[in-house]
């Protein structure tokens, strides 16, 4: 059963170094630091922020951004790491799967999250 669907859009230019420290998990910061240009760094952080805001809409409760880690498969497909999924279902109850998607278009990053309860 679908528990929640969330969508968020972020203007990439809103991202600055101060919010990056609040938005990204430790693992995400390590990946962020490997990018050379500011444009790519901002796009990366904006996409992660949009995912985390989408998850807040799914669960209808605030989630500390740094508790959630968004990674990418070899194919580029984004996913939540296992610890993040476990954290969310332990904190808010239930058991299931979380699907996410991120897209970038010009100055925007948009993300969608779908939480499916299997209980």
From Swiss-Prot:
A GO molecular-function descriptor: holo-[acyl-carrier-protein] synthase activity
GO CC entries: cytoplasm
Annotated localization: Cytoplasm
EC number, UniProt record: 2.7.8.7
Principal location listed in the UniProt entry: cytoplasm
UniProt keyword annotations, A-Z: Cytoplasm, Fatty acid biosynthesis, Fatty acid metabolism, Lipid biosynthesis, Lipid metabolism, Magnesium, Metal-binding, Transferase
Binding locations of Mg(2+): 8, 53
Role description: Transfers the 4'-phosphopantetheine moiety from coenzyme A to a Ser of acyl-carrier-protein.
Name of this protein: Holo-[acyl-carrier-protein] synthase
């Amino acid at each position: 059963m679908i528990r929640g669907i969330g969508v968020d859009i972020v203007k990439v230019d809103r991202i600055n170094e101060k919010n990056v420290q609040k938005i990204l998990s430790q693992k995400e910061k390590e990946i962020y630091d490997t990018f050379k240009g500011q444009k790519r760094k901002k796009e990366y952080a904006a996409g992660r922020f949009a995912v985390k805001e989408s998850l807040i809409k799914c669960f209808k409760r605030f989630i500390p951004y740094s508790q959630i880690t968004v990674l990418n498969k070899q194919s580029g497909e984004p996913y939540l790491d296992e610890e993040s999924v476990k954290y969310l279902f332990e904190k808010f109850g239930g058991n299931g799967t979380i699907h996410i998607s991120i897209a970038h278009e010009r100055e925007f990053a948009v993300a969608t999250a779908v939480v499916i309860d299997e209980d």
